[in-house]
Regions:
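Short cytosolic juxtamembrane segments of multi-pass membrane proteins
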Residues: 398-412
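Peri-transmembrane interface segments
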Residues: 14-25, 233-291, 300-302
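Membrane-interface junction motifs in transport/secretion proteins
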Residues: 49-83
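Short helix-loop junctions at transmembrane helix boundaries
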Residues: 338-381, 394-398, 402
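Transmembrane alpha-helical interface segments in multi-pass membrane proteins
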Residues: 298, 305-351
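A structural signal for hydrophobic secondary-structure junctions
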Residues: 80-221
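Hydrophobic alpha-helical transmembrane segments of multi-pass inner-membrane transport and secretion
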Residues: 20-46, 272-307, 330-339, 387-391
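Peri-membrane helix termini and adjoining interfacial loops of integral membrane proteins
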Residues: 1-9, 130-131, 258-260, 350-364
Length: 412
């Protein structure tokens, strides 16, 4: 074993009581807290962003194909387009596409004897994969469709049910606004109640049969409001949207492709802001860990100043003496990183298992904090903390170079 490593290990694992021993423990605790907070911050931010994003995508898909209306609001009714089997088949053949479904929306008013509530009815057909919405269903079942007529069933949000004092299997009168401005009443049975936790959705949407909307609008069976497309990786949304628009042969010039990020920018801009908070907190934790380690190293050098003088008097080079304290500090850092990683992952596991951290769903779109551990991020936190600490600790270690052996040996 090299001299520097031997002495560093003897100092590090020396059980003799001293002031530096207290400082070492304090530095380890600070490193543990810093590493744990960084891991927890990353895991909670990842979980939060993914959970909210997946809720948005599950309700609306990742990409919409509809009539080209650049200034159209995300909750406005669509202009009709005609189904095009050639285009939809070309989209389905894309390896990145999971499914494609027709839809249309129409404003309506739900009314009971005491209350009324405006909704935007989202019409779907029997080809729709209910698995996308299954996670949101709190009560009831999916719509049952008929081959000959439209379904007289509706799914409403728990918010709407609460406002109108409705429950599962109740009949509700619904008024649709026809193209000529007149109201057309109908009576539908509530077969399901959903809750996404996203206020914009829960206060706005009800789900019904696409055929009903076609009939109300006077559309033909092959006329729809658009298509919603689900893809494998939401990170590729924009690229896939552009690919569909520009590269599919005979793509209608009156059609447009828009990502859900384009339609709901406020939600995704808010999610992006979490990255700033995450980065600031991680940066602060790194600074805290480094300051504690620098303080610890300076105290270690000052406490062992006579040892430094003796080693230099015996002919030890400055770099050899520096390495003793650098390796000692590295041992302290490694202990802190290992314990901090275990502590941070433990908190994440506990949250996944028990959900002990609760959130206000109206504000955060979820009732408890979501966690997603990305292991390469954990590895980056550990290796980055170790590397940055080592490089920064090089600076105070240069104190050793200024020590004069004669004065250091006389130091008490």
């Amino acid at each position: 074993m090299k001299v520097a490593s031997f002495i560093a290990n003897r100092i590090a694992f020396n059980r003799q009581r001293s002031f530096s021993r207290f400082i070492i423990r304090l530095s380890i605790v600070a490193t543990v807290i810093s590493v744990a907070v960084m891991i927890v911050t990353l895991a909670f931010t990842n979980g939060f962003q993914e959970t909210v994003s997946q809720k948005v995508f599950s309700f609306w898909g990742h990409i919409r194909v509809q009539y080209k209306q650049p200034m159209k609001s995300s909750i406005a009714e669509e202009e009709q387009i005609e189904k095009n089997d050639t285009i939809t088949q070309a989209i389905r053949q894309k390896a990145v596409v999971v499914s494609i479904h027709p839809f249309a929306t129409k404003y309506a008013i739900l009314r009971t004897k005491e209350e009324m509530e405006g909704v935007l009815m989202k019409g779907l057909d029997s080809s729709y994969n209910f698995d996308h919405l299954k996670q949101f269903m709190k009560q009831g079942r999916w719509l049952r469709f008929s081959d000959t007529t439209y379904s007289r069933e509706i799914i409403i949000s728990s918010y709407t049910a609460g406002e109108l004092k409705l429950k599962l299997n109740d009949k509700v009168v619904i008024y649709f606004i026809k193209p000529d401005g007149s109201l057309r009443p109908d009576k539908l049975a509530i077969v399901g109640i959903y809750k996404t936790g996203i206020e914009d959705y829960d206060k706005t949407f009800a789900i019904g049969d696409l055929k009903l909307i076609q009939r109300l609008n006077g559309w033909k069976p092959n006329q729809i409001g658009g298509y919603e497309i689900f893809i494998k990786d939401y990170h590729d949304m924009q690229k896939i949207s552009d690919d569909l628009y520009y590269n599919i042969e005979n793509f209608p010039s009156t059609w447009d492709t828009r990502t859900i990020k384009d339609l709901y920018p406020n939600i995704f801009d808010w999610l992006s802001m979490q990255d700033v908070t995450r980065d600031v907190l991680i940066g602060f934790m790194i600074v805290v860990a480094i300051i504690n380690l620098i303080t610890c190293l300076i105290i270690l050098v000052l406490e062992r100043i006579r040892m430094v003088g003796v080693l230099k008097a015996l002919g030890a080079r400055n770099w050899t003496v520096q390495r003793i304290f650098l390796q000692h500090s590295t041992i302290i850092t490694c202990v802190g990183i290992i314990l901090g990683t275990a502590f941070g992952i433990g908190i994440c596991w506990l949250q996944q298992s028990t959900g002990f951290i609760k959130l206000k769903e109206e504000a955060y779109y979820m009732s408890e904090a979501a966690v997603k551990i990305v292991w390469w991020q954990v590895a980056l936190v550990c290796s980055g903390t170790l590397l940055i600490s080592f490089l920064v600790l090089m600076i105070p270690s240069f104190i050793v170079r200024r020590v004069r052996p004669v004065k250091a040996i006389q130091f008490r």
